[in-house]
Regions:
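Catalytic strand-loop segment that frames the active site of acyl-thioester-processing enzymes
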Residues: 30-60
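Active-site-proximal helix-loop elements at catalytic-domain edges
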Residues: 13-36
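Hydrophobic beta-strand-centered segment that forms part of the acyl-chain substrate-binding groove
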Residues: 75-105, 110
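HotDog/MaoC-like acyl-thioester-processing domains
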Residues: 1-13, 98-100, 110-153
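Compact, glycine-rich, soluble single-domain proteins
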Residues: 57-67, 71, 75
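Residue-level recognition of well-ordered beta-strand positions that form the cores
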Residues: 46-48, 91-93, 107-109, 123, ...
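A generic structural signal for short beta-strands and their flanking turns/coil linkers
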Residues: 29-31, 41-43, 86-90, 102-104, ...
Length: 153
């Protein structure tokens, strides 16, 4: 079927609601992760790789930061379709390191969603060097819904 687009004003209200929900995510804030953009079924988050907080022993973004960035993008993507999700599994393929001082982003795209499970593909990129850092796939369990956020917009 043809997807009906909501008016831009409504889309902006949904984005603002999801952003407000995630402004209370203490772990995201502690890591310095912020939302860049979102649309129905997709989200992009980013973080500047801080040498004091995020570096591994090789002066690159720690793999835990890369995986955390991907994981946060999945939860936000779920919220864009009105679903409160928790991670069941996330498999991350690390491709290339991102040096400290660079900004990395994770973009998630929902590939399947029903009332119980959401599956998502994620790409993590080094924005300063235009390189692919990691690819991940996640299975998210739906634990609740977010009132006022439709599944399609």
């Amino acid at each position: 079927g043809v997807k009906e687009e909501l008016p831009v004003v409504e889309a902006e209200k949904i984005k603002a609601k999801v952003s407000e929900i995630y402004s209370h995510n203490n772990f995201m804030q502690e890591c310095g992760i912020y939302i860049v953009d979102m649309s129905c079924g997709s989200a992009t988050v980013a973080v500047k790789v801080d040498p004091e907080r995020h570096a591994n022993l090789n002066g690159m973004a720690h793999g835990g930061l890369v995986a955390t960035l991907a994981d946060n993008a999945t939860g936000i993507a779920g919220a864009t379709i009105g679903k409160r999700v928790v991670t069941s599994t996330i498999a991350t393929d690390f491709i290339k390191g991102a040096p400290v001082g660079t900004t990395i982003s994770a973009t998630s795209r929902i590939t399947h969603a029903d009332d119980r499970l959401v599956t998502i593909n994620i790409e993590v990129r080094d924005l300063d060097n235009d390189t692919l850092v990691a690819k991940a796939t996640a299975a998210m369990i739906v634990v609740d819904t977010f009132a006022g956020i439709p599944e399609k917009w």
